Structures are given as C-alpha cells and as structure tokens.
C-alpha cells in the first residue's frame, strides 16, 4: 500500500494522511534514568505499509475506525489520535482511521497514528507542528519525521541517517500481545554498549544486513522469554534461503526479515502466509 498524497484541498474538504509502520533495525538499551525511563540507541526506519487517516476539519471532534485490524481499537479519549487533537487544542475535526497495522506489536502503530493526526490537525488549523510531541509518547517525535533516523536518549535525540539503501523486508506478527513494561522488567542488563558513534554507509541491502548482524535488539531476549512464539517466528523467517537477517522490532512481537530484492521478500511472505494463515504477514520496503 502506497501513502496517499497529503494536503488540504480548497475549502474544507477532508485531508488524508498515511501512518507508516515504524521498524527498529537496532535497539540498544544503554541505561536507565532515575525516573525509570530507559535510555536507548536505535536505528529506526519506516515501511511503505501502514494505517490511513482522513480528517474532516468541519465535523465534530471524534474518531471512527474501520479496516482489517479495527477490532479492539478504542475510539474514546484514551486513543492517541484524540490525545493528539487535544494536545493541539483542536475543538473540531473528525478523524476516520483505516487500521491495517496490528496493535501493541512493536511497530509504533499508535505513535505513528498520533503523529499523523498531529500533522492533519496542525494543517487544518494553520499551525506549526508542536515541538513537544514526546508528551504523547516517546516514539511520536521520530514518527513525525517518518524517515531513517538514529533515535537516542529516551527518544528525544533524533539524528537523520543518510546512506541507507531501501531495504526489502517481510514483517510478521503472530498475534500475541507482548506488554512493553513486562519486556523491560525482564531485561537483565540495562547498561549496554550503544551503536558506533558514526554509522557506516551501505551500497546494498546485503551490506546493511551484514552490519546490522553485529548490532542488537536488547529487548529481544526478554520478549522471547515472555512470548516463546517469537522464537518460532524468527526461525521461520530465518529459514528462508534468501533471508539476510531476521530480528524482532521494538518490544515485539513483530519480527522482520531483510532481503536483497522485493521479489524475494514477496515470495517469502507468500510462503509464510501459507504455512501460518493465522499470522499477520506483510512484504514491504523499509526506508
């Protein structure tokens, strides 16, 4: 699915936005602050699949949801989309969310939706984007960028990353919720080395995958302990002969596999979907 063109039409016609999946290619936990927040060093990229949002600026403030992953999505004030509207002080504007990404899956679906809602409401109100998006969640600032970024601190330190080729990939979620707080509690070592100060450039996905294999997702071991099905997901992805790297994203349970070509990723996705029709499987390109 390709992102729709964003922009406000003349008058008060609806404004469309795209909320891509966020993927942590690496996630190094480097410490923990006195207030409990964990310090991270993560290479973040975004998929070409995601949720779609449409804002009707003149309608009453509200949220409706449809789509293949709509079940269980709250439409009350606890939803980050409505929290984003409140954060900007919006008093009007109905958003319809077409939900394609699994929730609580380690791919930033809620944060990406919130970031897109901020953009749409800010555009409708003629306002600049706020610089305190982190008040809605640690992943919201990087989702506002929506491009390859090195994210550090508690998510507030963002550095653009150049020299990263498009990465054909398969995303797989087994349909198991892995609560993020439980994963962090299961982390045995909370002071781990960061990525190198200077990230290398890569000519091909294979070059990138080789380097990524020397890095980590420190949340993967505790997530696998909390949800052993992640072991099976990673084994299935890595078992494809064309897979360059298999790793978990974020705090799980979504995992990804990297491939050299989109055709290889598509073929792997078809095989995985056939073997596990109950899993969410999606080929994509990460950028």
Swiss-Prot record:
Record-listed ATP binding positions: 102-112
InterPro entries: GHMP_kinase_C_dom (IPR013750), GHMP_kinase_C_sf (IPR036554), GHMP_kinase_N_dom (IPR006204), IspE (IPR004424), Ribosomal_Su5_D2-typ_SF (IPR020568), Ribsml_uS5_D2-typ_fold_subgr (IPR014721)
Class of enzymatic activity (EC top level): transferase
Keywords on record: ATP-binding, Isoprene biosynthesis, Kinase, Nucleotide-binding, Transferase
Recorded metabolic or biological pathway in which this protein acts: Isoprenoid biosynthesis; isopentenyl diphosphate biosynthesis via DXP pathway; isopentenyl diphosphate from 1-deoxy-D-xylulose 5-phosphate: step 3/6
GO MF entry, a single one: 4-(cytidine 5'-diphospho)-2-C-methyl-D-erythritol kinase activity
Pfam family, any one: GHMP_kinases_C
SUPFAM superfamilies for this protein: GHMP Kinase, C-terminal domain, Ribosomal protein S5 domain 2-like
Enzyme Commission number(s): 2.7.1.148
One of the GO BP terms on file: isopentenyl diphosphate biosynthetic process, methylerythritol 4-phosphate pathway
Catalytic activity: 4-CDP-2-C-methyl-D-erythritol + ATP = 4-CDP-2-C-methyl-D-erythritol 2-phosphate + ADP + H(+)
Annotated catalytic residues: 22, 139
Family, similarity comment: Belongs to the GHMP kinase family. IspE subfamily.
Function: Catalyzes the phosphorylation of the position 2 hydroxy group of 4-diphosphocytidyl-2C-methyl-D-erythritol.
The protein, known as: 4-diphosphocytidyl-2-C-methyl-D-erythritol kinase
Designated gene of the protein: ispE
């Amino acid at each position: 699915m390709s992102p729709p063109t964003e922009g406000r039409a003349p008058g008060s016609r609806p404004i469309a936005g795209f909320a891509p999946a966020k993927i942590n290619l690496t996630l190094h936990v480097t410490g923990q602050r006195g207030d409990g927040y964990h310090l991270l060093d993560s290479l973040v990229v975004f998929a070409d699949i995601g949720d779609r949002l449409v804002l009707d600026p003149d309608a009453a403030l509200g949220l409706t949801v449809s789509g293949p992953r709509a079940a269980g999505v709250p439409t009350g004030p606890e939803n980050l989309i409505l929290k984003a509207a409140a954060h900007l002080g919006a008093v009007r504007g109905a958003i319809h969310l077409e939900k394609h990404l699994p929730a609580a899956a380690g791919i930033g679906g809620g944060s990406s939706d919130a970031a897109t809602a901020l953009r749409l409401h800010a555009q409708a109100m003629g306002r600049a984007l706020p610089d305190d998006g982190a008040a809605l969640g640690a992943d919201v600032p990087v989702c506002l960028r929506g491009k390859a970024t090195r994210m550090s601190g508690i998510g507030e330190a963002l550095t653009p990353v150049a020299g990263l080729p498009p990465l054909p990939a398969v995303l797989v979620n087994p349909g198991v919720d892995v609560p993020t707080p439980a994963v962090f509690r299961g982390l045995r070592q909370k002071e781990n080395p960061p990525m190198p100060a200077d990230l290398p450039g890569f000519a091909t996905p294979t070059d990138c995958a080789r380097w990524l294999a020397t890095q980590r997702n420190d949340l993967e071991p505790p997530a696998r302990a909390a949800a052993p099905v992640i072991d099976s997901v990673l084994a299935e992805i890595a078992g494809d002969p064309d897979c360059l790297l298999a790793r978990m994203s974020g705090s799980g349970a979504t995992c990804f596999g990297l491939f050299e070509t989109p055709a290889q990723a598509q073929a792997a996705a078809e095989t995985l979907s056939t073997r596990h029709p109950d899993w969410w499987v999606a080929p994509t390109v990460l950028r």
